[in-house]
């Protein structure tokens, strides 16, 4: 395809050079640029793509999309100037792969907590209903029944559109994806044709990137601002930010809630270690997930399925068959009678939700919590997480969790600042995460609950740029001498 044809996807400020040249590929990473590729110079958080135009030229690129025109323009090159290269990359990526999202019923899920569970359960539900479907998530990507590894919650525009192209070519009718705040802010989802948007909740997270809660909210809201009139916007009415999200959307707005008036409502009747009895839209259903947060997730899945035109009774029947997502309230029972739970909870609110779910299940028995905080991330949440964990646990172990470029001992000390004198008496500081988990299991007795929070599905510990193999679930099973039952 000629460069001239791609220009219709952009709103160029200026075009200098030959637009008749063929474009063989599109690249935003100069290391991946090939002969005849169109190089898009995107300004990132750590570097500026404009700096790598010479390298892209050396590797054979002769067409460039830029925000700033270079002083020197090599002969035979074409420079297309636009106001926003990130936005341009999204449009070009969609066009390069034949606008694949237009051939899918695409639903995006955003929010601080619950994105992975909601997107994954929707994918599983629609597969069980006989549809071919795709999934883009933190844990794994799926093209129908074929899994693909994932590196980001939301991939870059080129990888994302390539993935949707594979889904469309495989005959998928539906696609469900997590939409991170980073992806929205960086316009990775620009030019995608969404048929639905879902908002789960909003609490403190990613302030190391966004700077403030209002900016974090604004990034999430931009997703709904971009929805078309043909789409639905399903929001949590029990979250004060739910209706803020859809203030400026053109989409059809609908709500779900456990407490407030909403289009889709549910009530928890009874809680068990292996599930909950619920009323959902005045219909009784037993579900195999645990916790109020999962009641919201399931209700959200139900509402979205109904908005997509599915039969309500059939949706409820399949909802009762669905089980938890890997690393989300994943339970292991020891031969000694205590229960260990591995969960991805890595924000104060998520930690509170999980511990508040465990407390009534533990009854008079102990709750032992193992938790850390990620390095190079929002430092403000560290003492809050320790404080909230201590309030809800009989024993607390602070440990390492992806320290990245920071010293793990320093992160742990920053967490410990949130502890009172009394809290410190029941707290252990153990830097080695495996030792921390083993210690928690040694302290546990029959009927106790051990929560290992923060990593969930992750299979690595990131230290100074290197991802070392580490899986909380493997360590738990080893501590239980592999005599466990996965619920």
From Swiss-Prot:
Binding site for ATP: 111-117
Motif, Meso-diaminopimelate recognition motif: chain positions: 401-404
Any single GO CC term annotated in Swiss-Prot or TrEMBL for this entry: cytoplasm
Disulfide bond sites: none
Entry annotated with the keyword Cell wall biogenesis/degradation: yes
Cited PANTHER family: MUR LIGASE FAMILY MEMBER, UDP-N-ACETYLMURAMOYL-L-ALANYL-D-GLUTAMATE--2,6-DIAMINOPIMELATE LIGASE MURE HOMOLOG, CHLOROPLASTIC
Known role: Catalyzes the addition of meso-diaminopimelic acid to the nucleotide precursor UDP-N-acetylmuramoyl-L-alanyl-D-glutamate (UMAG) in the biosynthesis of bacterial cell-wall peptidoglycan.
Official protein name in the record: UDP-N-acetylmuramoyl-L-alanyl-D-glutamate--2,6-diaminopimelate ligase
Organism: Porphyromonas gingivalis (strain ATCC BAA-308 / W83)
């Amino acid at each position: 395809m000629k460069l001239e044809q791609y220009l219709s996807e952009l709103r160029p400020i200026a075009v200098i050079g030959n637009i008749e040249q063929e474009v063989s590929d599109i690249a935003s990473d100069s290391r991946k640029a090939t002969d005849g590729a169109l190089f898009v110079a995107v300004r990132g958080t750590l570097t500026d793509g404009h700096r790598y135009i010479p390298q892209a030229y050396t590797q054979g690129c002769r067409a460039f999309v830029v925000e700033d025109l270079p002083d020197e323009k090599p002969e035979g090159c074409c420079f297309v100037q636009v106001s926003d290269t990130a936005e341009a990359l999204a449009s070009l990526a969609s066009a390069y792969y034949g606008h694949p999202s237009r051939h899918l019923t695409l639903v995006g899920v955003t929010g601080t907590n619950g994105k992975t569970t909601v997107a994954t359960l929707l994918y599983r539900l629609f597969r069980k209903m006989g549809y071919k479907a795709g999934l883009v998530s933190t844990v794994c990507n799926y093209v129908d029944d074929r899994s693909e590894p994932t590196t980001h919650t939301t991939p870059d525009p080129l990888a994302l559109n390539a993935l949707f192209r594979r889904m469309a070519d495989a005959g998928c009718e539906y696609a469900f994806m997590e939409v991170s705040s980073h992806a929205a802010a960086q316009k990775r989802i620009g030019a995608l044709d969404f048929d639905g948007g879902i908002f789960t909740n909003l609490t403190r997270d990613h302030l190391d990137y966004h700077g403030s809660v209002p900016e974090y909210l604004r990034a999430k809201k931009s997703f709904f601002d971009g929805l078309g009139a043909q789409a639905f916007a399903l929001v949590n009415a029990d979250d004060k930010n739910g209706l803020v999200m859809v203030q400026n959307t053109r989409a059809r707005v609908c709500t779900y809630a456990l407490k407030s008036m909403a289009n889709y409502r549910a009530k928890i009747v009874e809680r068990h270690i292996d599930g909950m009895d619920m009323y959902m839209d005045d219909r009784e259903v037993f579900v195999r997930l645990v916790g109020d947060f999962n009641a919201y997730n399931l209700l959200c899945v139900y509402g979205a399925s109904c908005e997509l035109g599915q039969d309500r009774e059939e949706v409820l029947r399949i909802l009762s068959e669905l089980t938890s997502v890997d690393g989300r309230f994943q339970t292991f029972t020891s031969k000694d009678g205590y229960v260990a739970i591995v969960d991805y909870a890595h924000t104060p609110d998520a930690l509170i939700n999980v511990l508040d779910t465990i407390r009534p299940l533990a009854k008079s028995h102990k709750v032992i919590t193992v938790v850390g905080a990620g390095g190079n991330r929002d430092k403000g949440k560290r003492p809050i997480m320790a404080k909230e964990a201590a309030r809800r646990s009989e024993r607390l172990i602070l440990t390492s969790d992806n320290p990245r470029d920071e010293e793990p001992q320093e992160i742990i000390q920053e967490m410990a600042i949130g502890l009172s004198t009394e809290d410190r008496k029941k707290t252990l500081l153990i830097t080695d995460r495996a030792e921390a988990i083993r210690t928690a299991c040694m302290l546990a007795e029959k009927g106790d609950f051990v929560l290992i929070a923060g990593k969930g599905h992750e299979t690595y510990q990131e230290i100074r740029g290197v991802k070392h193999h580490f899986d909380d679930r493997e360590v738990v099973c080893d501590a239980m001498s592999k005599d466990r039952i996965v619920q």
